[in-house]
């Protein structure tokens, strides 16, 4: 693996950084403990299939059902209801994470080189973030997003995506 791995605390979140010299793209991904077990394999796969140098930032989400969902909803699996923390998570990425990464790597993170992605509820969060005004992302990647989430389809049909 050509990326250097670091675990750092940025604000209230632990972040797992995989960085390389001369990075041109920044991939931000909210993750839970299960996702962190797959990160090495994921980074290796991207390295093997892309020539573009990149930095991958995994943000460990502490309360999965609360921090990634844009509005409250009753529990679907188990007993934990969904919250409305997506707004706060997006503000964390914009106001704390991105400035910290700019300072750490002395590189320009901007709308032309920053990608947000996620799996499951993090995929839903990524899709939702792509509909928000003035987001600093060029693109959104969403694998198996939780599009079943209460109200999501109505929201997506009544709003316009703001990313390319």
Residue positions per predicted region:
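Non-catalytic cap/lid and distal C-terminal segments of serine-dependent acyl enzymes
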Residues: 1-164
